[in-house]
């Protein structure tokens, strides 16, 4: 399973790391996703949820 929020769809993003000489090398920024137990179709399930979804109350832990 990919590290992607099942509620908001947040996932890692890619871009460039820039050195002092402005040389570019590829890098990724990981989304702040936590593995939590939530109710999915009335049953508890462990899924990845973003910290923003947890803070805003879009999902509740079981």
UniProtKB/Swiss-Prot annotation:
One of its GO terms (biological process) is translation. GO terms for cellular component: ribonucleoprotein complex; ribosome. Belongs to the bacterial ribosomal protein bL28 family. Residues 1-28 are annotated as: Disordered. Pfam families: Ribosomal_L28 (PF00830). HAMAP family: Ribosomal_bL28. Residues 14-26 have a biased composition (Polar residues). One of its GO terms (molecular function) is structural constituent of ribosome. It comes from Bacillus licheniformis (strain ATCC 14580 / DSM 13 / JCM 2505 / CCUG 7422 / NBRC 12200 / NCIMB 9375 / NCTC 10341 / NRRL NRS-1264 / Gibson 46). InterPro entries: Bacterial_rp_bL28, Ribosomal_bL28, Ribosomal_bL28/bL31-like_sf, Ribosomal_bL28_bact-type, Ribosomal_bL28_sf. This is Large ribosomal subunit protein bL28. Transmembrane segments: none annotated. The keyword Cytoplasm does not apply. It comes from the Bacteria. The gene is rpmB. Keywords: Ribonucleoprotein, Ribosomal protein.
């Amino acid at each position: 399973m990919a590290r992607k929020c099942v509620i908001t769809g947040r996932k890692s993003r890619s871009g460039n790391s820039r050195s002092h000489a402005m040389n570019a090398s590829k890098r990724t920024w990981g989304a702040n996703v936590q593995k939590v137990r939530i109710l999915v179709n009335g049953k508890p399930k462990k899924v990845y949820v973003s910290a923003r979804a947890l803070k805003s109350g879009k999902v509740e832990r079981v």
